[in-house]
Amino acid sequence: MALTIATWNINSVRLRAELVAGFLKAEAPDILCLQEAKSPVEKIPFEVFAALGYGHAVARGQKGYNGVAILSRVPLEDGGHVDFCAKGDARHVAARLPGGTVLHNFYVPSGGDVPDPEANPKFAHKLEFLDEMCAWGARQDGPAILVGDLNIAPLEADVWSHKQLLKVVSHTPVEVEALDRVRTAGGWTDVIRAHIPAPEKLYSWWSYRARDWAEADRGRRLDHIWTRGGIAAVPGSSRILRDWRGAERPSDHVPVLATFEL
């Protein structure tokens, strides 16, 4: 069975429910994983998405912050969640797909503005989260897909300027090394880069601060799709849908998707 899975940091699912609906109509992925839903579960507008055929869902919500959800046209089993760093914030949810593959949806902490764990508790939290994610991944077995906003652009080709961003949170060496440990410990493959290798530039996020985001094109690839346990994406199916950054009232992230034979 071929399944197309998309991931998108939507930056408030209630504010952008119609944007999500427009994406589902235009691209029709089988599964959409959302991050930064910024809503309690009971207030996520599931009925809007169910009306479009996405009647299966699992989610973890939080008022005004974080939040992850998986919307699907195919039946899902709730795979539970892990409370990384024991903070009670909604940053992970899992679902078991038909055939047994587990889908993990992550929203890794952004880490604040100062890349110093001594001076910045948010950055310390990010590094702790990644350490726990590394240990968690090493314990996993069986086929799995991991998607989400991992808030790190690991490669030089994943940022508009490697040199200028080396001391900017999301591309610092300590973060890149931590993410690489997570990937290695879990035996994960970066699907997007397997299909579209460096040095081709790839971005999935552009700051709201730019007057003209497209002209400036100062992007970063913060959103990822990984696989393990023999799962491979259909060659050539990986896409980053840049045009959605130009939508009315857009998220600062765009959808990333790939198709799998499961």
Name each model-derived stretch.
Residues 1-52, 58, 65-68:
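N-terminal, active-site-proximal structural segment of metallo-dependent hydrolase catalytic domains
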Residues 2-12, 100-115, 147, 253:
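Active-site-proximal beta-strand elements of phosphoester/diester hydrolases
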Residues 11, 38, 107-109, 151-153, ...:
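Catalytic metal-binding/acid-base residues of hydrolase active sites
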Residues 30-31, 145, 224:
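Short, Asp-centered acidic motifs that coordinate Mg2+ and/or phosphate
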Residues 37-40, 44-113:
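Structured beta-strand-rich core segments of catalytic domains in phosphoester-bond hydrolases
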Residues 78-83, 155-262:
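Metal-dependent phosphoester-hydrolase catalytic domains
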Residues 108-133, 163-168:
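Surface-exposed cleft-lining segments at the edges of enzyme active sites
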Residues 142-156:
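Acidic/histidine-rich, metal-coordinating catalytic segments
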